[in-house]
Structures are given as structure tokens and as C-alpha cells.
């Protein structure tokens, strides 16, 4: 377990916005502290020294905004992570500091926590994957003990199943897919397909080895043709996108008596060099979407043209990182996991922007909801400031609600996307063409539906050969029903590379950011 913690820390240690407790993120025990005094409370907080309890167990009460409502888990310091909803809209989540599952009933706003009698005493594990099965059971992963767990909602009993591994393994995301359970083994470098219909503790399984040695295997998504898409990547060195034809493979196995190579049923696509940490992946309307946790970007892949398109988020608000010492020069949002909703929009969590975002590919719009709770231990925060991160590591979509967990604030929360947005954004033109060295202006209109103060512009652009500027640099106020036109200047440098690029234009208040993408074409 210690070896695994070190390996994972190497990959994820730089994902934190600051160096504060960076290596602790996926370890099973808290990091060494100068003050190791532990005041026993008889609660899960006892797994942390007194000096680290505010950092890992929560720094304040549950909060709300117009769009977000949080709920505090009754048991302190549970470190909630993987989350899912059942068919009745109940919310289920795994507690990494207790080994329990918990249920939240949105109708009564009540929690029920289910003791896990076979969980090791004082055990801790990152539980990244959870899904609900039609038979009323919940399946979830456990990286510390290389396990897959089944919880029956009928008899409220847990069953632990050893995860098939050779050497290091880290069962991460999990999906119930028809009659099988699919899991990515992050450090074991494979995708595993389990048959859950067996009653014993040793389930039949198929392991799909990854084609890149020394890499990790990221999240996966399944398209309408039952192809499995996933990533292999090497930390800070890039990687590949993989398509596995599982139907073709299984059909061949059924009719062929010899030995088949699973790798004969995969296609490989090189990831763009800008995409270094493709954690999350989703399929929507035939397109593949990837979340890059090393940047502020989401990438779209078109399987027909085999082209990638980069979509950038807004910059994190200063309330998420503080920058009281001035050490943070270029804050990034770090999109982590990504899932489609029923409308084909892409929902993703922005880890270091403390936000849940919705990208609409049809309207090319982006809405980012700020989560109100912030733990100052995870930012460069001044004393007594409203600053930091709640560490939103997972979410679940149910109708127009997005439920999420706050790993270091001991809360769950919900974004209500049915609530009307306070303003709209319209671009005068969605397309701009430039030759290298040229500048052009583009205008967009902000249409407020209510009084708005402390409004600021969003001018996001991930390319060092493009510059997007405006003469509006300070925050401003908007009156309801009075549209405001904003003009920006887009400049291509002399060495700009020909191609099509997306920039993000919009506005933000503290609770929500609303933007639209414009396409900039650099001509030869």
C-alpha cells in the first residue's frame, strides 16, 4: 500500500494548485506533520493529527448560493468521494475515511450511513468509482485493498471481491454496463470487464492490457456501438486515445477456437501534445471528450476526421487560490472527470476552480457554477479569508440536478441547473479570420436579467500565439434589461500557426460564469 501511495503521488502530486499536502491526495494515511498530537474523539477524525483536521475534516458549515445548496454529513470527517444516484433520485456516496456507503434522500434532506463491519479498523481508501445496478445493488472500487465492493440495498450487507491484479493495481472508475462491470486499473495499466452474475468472491473477468508500457490507464466511456474508449498516458509526456471493439472481439471468441489477441481489436490515436493528463472521458453525439487535469482545457475528438479541438475554461477566481504570497503566476482550473447529460451537454468538475461546469457543444457555450465552501488549507490563502478549495472530486447527474461531493469539507451538494441564469451572452460573430501579425475586433453583448455588481470579463485563450484584450479591465455593474456591448481585440503573432482555434468570451460574478466560444482561424 505504501508503494502504491508513492507511485500515485508521483502522478498526482503536481495536480494540486499549491504544494500544500500535494502528495496526500491519494495516500491512505495523512502526511507527516510536525505536530502529531491526536486528541481522541471516537470519530473518523481520529485518523488525522489535530493539526490536520481542519485541512481534511472541514473548515466550516455547509453553504448555499442561488444555484448551489450544500448539506453537511452527520458523521464528521468522512471524506466523501464517489457519488451516484439511484432510479428514485436518492443520492449514494462512498466515504474514504470510514469505508461506508451513505444515502441522502433529497425529499427529506436526511442521511443514512451504513456501517461496513468488514472494513479494516482505521482503514482509509480512495474510492473513485461507484455505480448503481438494476438489481438494487451498488458497486464501488477501493484502491487501498485492491477491491471491488458490492452493497445490497435490500439486505444492507457488503461483499468484498478481490480485484484481479498482478503487481501494482489501482481500481479507479467503475460502470455497470449491461451484464458486466467495467473498471479501469489506473496503475495496473488495463481495463477489466467483470461478470457480476457469479455468487462467489472470485468473479470471471477479462483484462484488456494497454498497448503502452510504463503508462497509466485513464477513465473510459462506451459509445452507442458498444466500443470502449479510454486513454493511456505517461505523466507529463502525453499519451494515446484507444478504441476497443468489444463486440467484434466477443463475437470472434464465440466462433473461433484458437487464441485471439485482444490488441487486434483496438485502434490507437495519438493525443495532441498539449493534452498531458487526460483523466476524464465522455462520449456525446458520436464525439469523444477528454478532460485535461494539467491545464484549463477540455478536448473534443471527432472519430470521423480524427481531429482534436481544444476548449478552454475561464481562469479560476482568486477566491479559490488566494495568492497571498504572490507565488501563483498562472492559475489553471484542472478539469477532472467529465460526463454527458441527457441533453448531450458535457458536465465536468474543475478541481482547482472549485466549480462544476456545463459545456454545450451545440451552442458552444460554457456555464461554470462556483461551489461556495472553500477550505483555506488547499490554497495560498490569507488568514480569515474566504478562500480555498472543497476538493470536488466526483459528481452525479440526475435530471436537472448535479450532485457532488466535497472531499475535504465533509459535505455533499447539488447544482440546480433549472434556475434561470442572471445574464446572457451573445457574440456579434462566432468566427474571426486572421493572418499572422493581424489584429481584429469582435464584440459581444451581456444581457442582464437583474441588478449585477462586481461583474468582470472572461477572455480566455490557451494559445501563446494569440492575444485577446479589452479596454475594460476593472469590475463593473449592470442594470436589469439594459444590454451592454463589449469589444475585444484579437491579435495573432507573426509566428501564429495556421489552423482553427477556440477562445472563450463572457462575463462572471462570484457565483456563476457564463461564456461562449468563438472560432479564430489563422490563415496561411
Language model features: what each stretch is:
Residues 382-422:
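Blade-level signature of beta-propeller repeat domains, shared across WD40, Kelch, NHL, RCC1
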Residues 419-524:
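Long beta-sheet-rich domains in secretory-pathway and surface-associated proteins
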Residues 56-57, 66-73, 115-121, 162-166, ...:
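Surface-exposed loop and turn segments in beta-propeller and other repeat-based domains
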Residues 1-40, 505, 524:
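Secretory targeting signatures
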Residues 37-67:
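Blade/loop signatures of beta-propeller domains
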Residues 91-97, 140-144, 183-188, 228-236, ...:
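Conserved beta-strand positions in repeat-built beta-propeller and related beta-rich domains
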Residues 46-51, 72-99:
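Beta-strand-rich domains and repeat architectures in extracellular enzymes and scaffolds
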